[in-house]
Amino acid sequence: MAHGRDRILVTGWFSFLHGEATAGDVLALHRVEEVLRGAGLAHDVVWSPGFRADGTHFAEVDPAAYSRLLFVCGPVHGPQVEELHRRFAHCVRIAVGVSVVDPASPAVTGFDRVLARDGSGSGSGPGLDLSARAPGLPRVPVVGVVLTHGQHEYGGRRRHAEVAAGLTRWLAGKDCARLELETRLDAHDWRLCGTPAQLESVLARLDLVVTDRLHGLVLALRAGVPALVVDPVTGGAKVTAQAHACGWPAVVAAERLVGRRVTGEAEYGEPGYEELGYGELEYGEPEYREPEYGELERWWRWCLADGRDEAARIGAGFRAADAVADAADGLVAVLGAGAGAAAGGTGRRPEA
């Protein structure tokens, strides 16, 4: 952070330790920064350490380094805003793009100028929110996340908790828009889809699905959307089998997302290593090694490139007249055989 007596300090609710950074607030900040840069005005932005740990924080700001303070967006209200007036009393203080709840409150009267978005005290009507004219943003992938924490029938082979923890930690570092989705339908909970058509409509609008569920895989492909799949069962189970049946290659084994702990001097993968659930890893301890994410990264890139066409091809194949056979194709014959066995007292043993 460069200092200069004529610098401007830019603040907002995104600056407070116990504030919050909304997308609208940060876009409003981008609009203000665009204007300041265009005018050649030097400035620094204060961030909450809880949101941007590597940014400039109030704890390290020298008030004497600034002659002006801007407060951007949100309601001008409360003790946190009032504290700005006390700490930066020597600065010209301006609120821009804000809402005024109580014009007589110290939080409002402490500003030298208030450029409100709701028109309060300006003698004019409401103004356009600053976020509307913020600089354009790049598009990022929209990713549906469909995970399960159940399937206890797999007993000791279950790695569902570790897989979910590893996947979500990895996803948190990806520049994408994540949507947590459920294949479970519910007629009463507005958060969940009530019909298959509703869920399929959501899936069809995604760029990618990340899942450890069989139906997360199949429904994504049915919608023509690539799926990055992790089988949560050690050694592989129904998820891996279904991926093979669909002809879908982007499957990662659970073992890749399970951390390992060193016991003694053993090398990675040797008997001296103990398998450890990802959620139990103690970070910072030298004897722990994190899960491998290289395979996830490789399939992520493939799914967002060639995988798009492959998923569309497979999805179209599901609906084709000459689609690959499924178990229902032989159902009528089995039902007929069953009826004959019931009438005649004989029947054939089910096929293995």
Model regions and ranges:
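Active-site anion-handling motifs in enzyme catalytic cores
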Residues: 1-352
